Amino acid sequence: MASLHRPVLIAAMAAAALTAAACHREGAQPAADSHAEHAPSTPKLGDFGFDAAGMDRSVAPGDDFFGYASGNWVRTTQIPEDRSSFNSFVSIAIETERHSRDIIEGAAANDRVTGEDKQIGDYYAAYMDEASIETKGVRPVQPELEAIAQLGDKQALARTLGGQLRADVDLLNATNFYTDRLFGLWVSQDLHHPGRYAPYLVQGGLGMPERSFYLDGGRMADLREAYRAHIVKVLELAGIADAAARAERIVALETAMARVHATPERTNNVQAGANAWKQADFAHNAPGLEWALFFDAAGLKAQQDFIVWQPEAVRGLSALVQSEPLQTWKDYLSFRALDRASPYLSKSFADERFAFYGTTLEGTPQQRQRWKRGIDATNAALGEAVGKRYVQKYVSAQTKTRAEEMVKNLVTAFGRRIDALEWMTPETKQHAKAKIAGLTVAVGYPDSWRDYSALEVRRDDALGNVERAQLFEYRRNLAKLGKAVDHREWYMLPQEVNALNVPLENRLIFPAAILQPPFFDPAADDAVNYGAIGAVIGHEISHSFDNMGALFDEHGELHNWWTPQDLKKFEAAGNALAAQFSAYKPFDDLSVNGKLTLGENIADVAGLATAYDAYQLSLQGKQPQTIDGFSPDQRFFLGFAQAWRGKYRDAALRNAVLTDVHAPGRFRAQTVRNVDAWYPAFDVKPEQQLYLAPEQRVKIW
């Protein structure tokens, strides 16, 4: 999919539960001038921007390039007790978190602030007011529980389910498919009509990450028992009687949902998801749920056109609304309300939620400190308001300009690679060149900021703030319907450590936070920067031409621009890369899913090759010197490999392999084996483990 990296599972699920809030951009303020004008003059890592001490030179690079580049770092680095993994993204996120804390706590401590500063401060202060939250106990969620208890028929159930719909998934940008509500909504450019927005309806309703957690044996059976116990505990904390019997019904209902859910591979298939339905089609195509009542309560009564991403799942979930007893649905909705609210209720609820989702599912020993969770919550609700202040204080204009120059070099290099393709016909090349020519790029931060002035934030209402933020974001998305597509919208925050390809708009976004070591250091050697952030930029460019991006034309319309023979060759190369990654086994009983991760792997291979070409172009015929015994090419590939260094707890790694469209970092680092220049750089021999014969090296772009 389109983002460079997905946070670990529990963070991704938390993000789904707390969606960023914003309103219209009319009257949005221009981007503030950066106050952080001066970039450092010396590299943060080592003498030239690379952590040579993190290497393990006893490992042959041709046998395990990840181990060679980062083996000592892996041995000596401890995963923080409050994390399920640690990697380059997390190391930058920790630094960025400190910056966000300075901004947010400063606003909370100043009783004279107004406007967005007051909203930021009040939101955080409400979350941090543990004494008030403890005193309230379960009371903040009681009105919702009482409303659920009063449901008298399936018509009322349909209205409740519709009223709970939120804009809490993102199919093609952030690769977030998870929602614990029965359905998720994504409002984005229409696959078939690029000039307008469409609402995408997505499967949901599960408390655990995806269907295999309910249907598979072995470890999954143990997790189901732990989940059942978690449900019992949450219901008991709320004082709900017959908790064990209710938990049995809830697990049985969610298991039935899991049976009709699409697999991750199917969900990742954009062609299978491009199902245009009229509102009138739902009653016939997915009988069971009273759809007219559902859409009315969801504020979508007048909306006629939808895209249904998993029609079989929508059909199955709708049928369950009709077939399962009303009381079972009431039990389920009561638990969902409590579980969703738990982080904002008293300590016993928050601790129980972490015990299951953090420790049992992810293996994380310790819950993050409350201030860290408060920073996350505030960023989720008021992200661009915090981001504007982050940019003013911490983002160097010099860094932004340097990154923009690198992007231009990478785009030029990719265009030349298209010209040089021997297997592609001129007809297909013409379309590919049009797409690269139409690519637009945003670096650092948006040109205008969202206006949060209409969002109500109360200093004494932590849960209410979250719910109002979610509803506010939902209404912001609904307001897009019927309007022209806004190609200025950012789908990531400046303080977010990630990068993004927006396939429906043929656009790239590089937030400011990723422009930090080890990905980018303005004082580092160019070879290292091109290997690290250059490969990231190349990765995002290449997403426009991966197995999903290649389905879209230069206008973001889903339409086949390939000749049959070219498409056949492209798919054959993709199959070879999928087989290559499926051979990687992080556990004896679990392999990487090469098909699920194919889009990311194509982007890694093409992105690395493009970054190498761009680096060579940047030299303008000059030959850089050897530094500390490393040639320029060696520094380039080592910069790439160290950017992907990381460690997982076993439970988190298993979950990532099952659910993430990105392969684990250690295998992404081995992408080098598909690039010809890597072999002479490290004198890789045919008998070494990573060696691929020239005809086996995957070269798609």
Model-identified regions with their sequence ranges:
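Bacterial N-terminal signal peptides that target proteins for export
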Residues: 1-11
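C-terminal motif of bacterial Sec signal peptides marking the signal peptidase cleavage site
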Residues: 19-22
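Bacterial signal peptide processing site
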Residues: 24-26
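Post-signal peptide N-terminal segment of mature Sec-exported envelope proteins
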Residues: 29-45
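Intrinsically disordered, low-complexity linker/terminal regions across diverse proteins
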Residues: 39, 43, 256, 280, ...
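Active-site-surrounding "flap" and adjacent substrate/cofactor-binding loops of secreted or lumenal enzymes
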Residues: 41-46, 59-135
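Hydrophobic/aromatic-rich, well-ordered segments within soluble, folded domains that form packed cores
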Residues: 55-75, 214-235, 598, 605-610
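Noncatalytic, helix-rich "gating/capping" subdomain that lines the substrate-entry/channel surface
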Residues: 106-409
